[in-house]
A protein has these predicted regions:
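Acidic, glycine-anchored loop motifs typical of Ca2+
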Residues: 16-18
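Domain-level detector of nuclease and nuclease-like folds
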Residues: 43, 52-171
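Short acidic, Pro/Gly- and aromatic-enriched capping/linker segments at domain boundaries
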Residues: 6-9
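A charge-rich, low-complexity, intrinsically flexible signal that marks solvent-exposed coils, linkers
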Residues: 37-46
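Beta-strand-rich, non-transmembrane domain signature
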Residues: 25-27
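Short, small-residue-biased leader/transition segments that mark boundaries at the very start
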Residues: 1-2
Length: 171
């Protein structure tokens, strides 16, 4: 039975820099990043060019504003579970749940719309990002030896057909 917490997301400092993975992703994906205070891991504000929608979003940490920018698992945790993660060790699930290759800062509404959907059922509305998105899904599924349904394969092939010399990301 799928349980999100078995992937350990957000409680882990994978790169041992003292910051949880959410802060690492925000610091990587936002521009004009400002931290709460000097030497802090906590991102106070920044500008996200959302890859899923193409919109620019001003991120400001706060109870009413932080959800505007969320961290998405490109291959959703539930999709990974259904694709083979159910048989992994605890350590491998932690690694997957916190793998920077599989994490992107995105518009909260787009992340909620996507939910646990695979590329067969959801693609970014920003068509110029679809090649990168599908390539990243393939890279993650390949890295972790996750299965791909026939519907996913058709959707991925359809998108990649229009991508000239698309390469798989490795980080």
């Amino acid at each position: 039975m799928y349980k999100r917490q078995v992937f350990g997301y957000r409680t882990t400092d994978v790169d041992k820099n003292g910051c949880d993975v959410r802060e690492d992703v925000l610091a990587r994906d936002l521009k004009q990043v400002r931290f709460k205070y000097s030497g802090s891991c906590k991102v106070a504000s920044g500008l996200l060019h959302d890859p899923y929608t193409g919109l620019n979003i001003n991120f400001v940490r706060g109870r009413k504003t932080s959800a505007l920018v969320q961290i998405d698992h490109v291959v959703a945790l539930e999709n990974a579970w259904q694709s083979g993660a159910w048989k992994w060790s605890h350590a491998k699930r932690l690694k997957f749940g916190n793998d920077m290759l599989n994490l992107l800062a995105v518009q909260g509404a787009a992340n909620q719309e996507k939910g646990s959907a695979s590329a067969a059922y959801w693609l970014p509305s920003n068509k110029s990002f679809r090649c990168d998105y599908v390539a990243r899904q393939i890279a993650v599924k390949y890295k972790y030896d996750l299965s791909v349904t026939n519907a996913e394969k058709r959707s991925m092939a359809s998108i990649l057909h229009g991508c000239s010399a698309q390469k798989l990301p490795n980080s």
